[in-house]
Swiss-Prot record:
HAMAP family assigned to the protein according to its UniProt record, in alphabetical order: Coprogen_oxidas (MF_00333)
Organism, scientific name: Chelativorans sp. (strain BNC1)
GO CC list: cytoplasm
Single biological process term from Gene Ontology: protoporphyrinogen IX biosynthetic process
Gene behind this protein: hemF
Keywords for the protein's UniProt record, in alphabetical order: Cytoplasm, Heme biosynthesis, Metal-binding, Oxidoreductase, Porphyrin biosynthesis
Domain of life: Bacteria
Residues of the active site: 131
Pathway the protein acts in: Porphyrin-containing compound metabolism; protoporphyrin-IX biosynthesis; protoporphyrinogen-IX from coproporphyrinogen-III (O2 route): step 1/1
Chain's role: Involved in the heme biosynthesis. Catalyzes the aerobic oxidative decarboxylation of propionate groups of rings A and B of coproporphyrinogen-III to yield the vinyl groups in protoporphyrinogen-IX.
Name of the featured protein: Oxygen-dependent coproporphyrinogen-III oxidase
Pfam family, one: Coprogen_oxidas
Length: 304
């Protein structure tokens, strides 16, 4: 997707807006962690004899605290083999390489960014892997970005007609249509399909969702407040629909063949994240927390 022109300049109360965004991402983190721990408690099928998982939170600092930091939340449980829910608020200067790629950074390399990232790798092959992130970025310009996408592990579930895919797309469509002044569902859906694609495999990573970036709407459409409200609702919709999908599937029995297929599909996930994912590259090249960034990788993987 071609990068749009983002008008220069920041609102007078940009510091208040930064604080509101940071506070929301941390509130959403707590909501998601509580929801996923609740699913750990609810399990009654395979692996229910194991203890339910709980998140372990690890604060980290960038540049010894001079560049901000974040909190890495990781859980290894009986529903989720590995799940990370991470928040960060960082600031600093872009490298010369990045200045040419980031809107507003060529005029002034200083930046501020806050966001949340979620990646869940379930134990049960019938439960799809999911990813969600939302963020606010400030240079000499300001914008929001983010999205959510679903990756079924079993080929027989990798269909747009599968009930999980239908539910996920319905939730993402609903949130976009609720904020139609700033969110274009078809555009964001197509952007997701275009972004989460493995060219070397000539296949999509999953069944899609939505993806958006460089969102800065004009005042007549609601401006910052409308963009922020949409970004908040993306997070809320994600929590709602993923809980529903997990509950529908997590008590289903699986076979060794299902597990084998899951591990091979996870390999595709690793390939995408290390070769193509902009967030991974951005984090590693701006002094982010390496463990947090690479926690998106699944704990066990196979390549045939």
């Amino acid at each position: 997707m071609e990068q749009p022109h983002i008008p220069a300049g920041l609102p007078e109360d940009v510091e208040n807006k930064k604080e509101a965004a940071r506070a929301w991402f941390e509130t959403l983190r707590d909501k998601i962690c509580a929801a996923l721990e609740g699913l750990e408690d609810e399990l009654s099928g395979p692996h229910s004899s194991y203890a339910p998982g709980r998140f372990e939170q690890t604060p980290w600092l960038r540049q010894e605290g001079a560049g901000g930091g974040g909190v890495m939340s990781i859980m290894h449980g009986r529903v989720f083999e590995k799940v990370g829910v991470h928040t960060s608020t960082v600031h600093g200067e872009f490298s010369p390489e990045f200045r040419r790629q980031i809107p507003g950074a060529e005029e002034d390399p200083r930046f501020w960014a806050s966001g949340i990232s979620v990646i869940a790798h379930p134990q049960n092959p019938h439960v799809p892997t999911v990813h969600m992130n939302t963020r606010m970025v400030v240079t000499t310009r300001q914008w929001f970005g983010g999205g959510a996408d679903l990756t079924p592990m079993l080929n027989r579930r990798r269909s747009q007609e599968d009930p999980d895919a239908i539910a996920f797309h319905k939730a993402m469509r609903f949130v976009c249509e609720r904020h139609a002044a700033v969110a274009d569902y078809e555009k964001f859906k197509n952007w997701c399909e275009e972004y989460f694609f493995l060219p070397h495999r000539n296949e999509p990573r999953g069944i899609g969702g939505i993806f958006y970036d460089w969102l800065k709407s004009p005042e007549e459409n609601g401006g910052w407040d409308a963009d922020f409200a949409f970004t908040q609702d993306v997070g809320r919709a994600f929590v709602m629909v993923y809980q529903h999908i997990v509950r529908k599937n997590f008590n289903t029995n699986w076979t060794e063949a299902d597990r084998e297929e899951q591990l091979i599909r996870r390999g595709r996930y690793v390939e995408f994240n290390l070769l193509y994912d902009r967030g991974t590259i951005f984090g590693l090249k701006t002094g982010g927390n390496v463990n947090s960034i690479l926690s998106s990788l699944p704990p066990v993987v196979k390549w045939p």
